[in-house]
Amino acid sequence: MASNDKGLEEIPDSQIESNYDEITDSFDSMELKPELLRGVYAYGFERPSAIQQRAILPIVKGNDVIAQAQSGTGKTATFSISALQKLDPNVKACQALIVAPTRELAQQIQKVVIAIGDFMNIQCHACIGGTAVRDDMNALREGPQIVVGTPGRIHDMIQRRVLKTDQMKMFILDEADEMLSRGFTEQIYDIFQLLPQSTQVVLLSATMPQDVLEVTTKFMRDPVRILVKKQELTLEGIKQFYIAVEKEEWKLDTLSDLYETVTITQAVIFCNTRRKVDWLTDKLTARDFTVSAMHGDMEQAQRDVIMKEFRSGSSRVLIATDLLARGIDVQQVSLVINYDLPANRENYIHRIGRGGRFGRKGVAINFVTADDVRMMREIEQFYSTQIEEMPMNVADLI
């Protein structure tokens, strides 16, 4: 237990102190199984991101690890690669358990695990609310090596004894700050009580509020602490522009003009409210643009269909709210449009960090009214980045 550890006291800007600084700057030098390495490259990775360079090896070595990193830094692949490296494909039982705050994120993690583990003959099942319990029970009886899910459903499955814990080696908590702020603390503590004492714990969180630190002191043994600072986040490779729009009402015409100029392979358009998402969807549909929309008011099944269509490329433009910024990870997104600038600067990275992840190129275009200029300057300062006026030849850049 690390409860007396100075580094775990909350620091004013809620950052942990790193106690580990070894870097492995290529996947080849991580001594991964050949079939896993093949999956990593097939997925489209070329070189590890900042968090992957630091965290994969200590996790694979069996240390408890706390990693503080924002969305869009490659953390899903960090723990997916680590778990795949550690598990035994011949043992048909859950060896790595991953909990996440939302269904979308859980499904996203499942897709990444399956894609990277494509050549390994492993199974990964997602246990999430809003689906039939019987389906989960049947899938878990097959003994998938990795199970990912939301805390409520995972806890339920362990209690029903269909999710067996006796072979579990790793317990991974993704977006721990989000999970605890959504009121899952008790369920997470209950899950911990049901796991073998020897289970390795890996916790990932964008911020380190007191309740997250409490989890780390209670359940982690002498953890390796890794902080990926804000400036290491990947706004690299993403060209950021703004279009000055005199009035809010003119944004729609601006967007239509942009549609005419640019061939969009795939784009996400962010608005700040659900109502605005619906309004914009109606307006664009009326102008014969094909768009789909997604926000938190929708039924789970409906959201799944929309995400599926978007991932497969049959729908090209997705209009969404911040709530879902964390759950959208589509490799082909070449363009992110902030129809509204985010209400807080932290969400900027969640939104546009999608566009050019891990060295993939992307373009972000911000619609900025006079009222937004201050926020845009704050965003530039916060991320030490430059948002330039959109050039005439923007079509060549996308």
UniProtKB/Swiss-Prot annotation:
Any one cellular-component term (Gene Ontology): cytoplasmic stress granule
PROSITE patterns the record matches: DEAD_ATP_HELICASE, HELICASE_ATP_BIND_1, HELICASE_CTER, Q_MOTIF
Residues involved in ATP binding: 69-76
Motif segment (DEAD box): 174-177
Designated name of the protein: ATP-dependent RNA helicase eIF4A
Motif extent (Q motif): 25-53
Family: Belongs to the DEAD box helicase family. eIF4A subfamily.
Entry-linked Pfam families: DEAD (PF00270), Helicase_C (PF00271)
EC assignment: 3.6.4.13
GO molecular function: ATP binding; ATP hydrolysis activity; RNA binding; RNA helicase activity; translation initiation factor activity
Subunit organization: Component of the eIF4F complex, which composition varies with external and internal environmental conditions. It is composed of at least eIF4A, eIF4E and eIF4G.
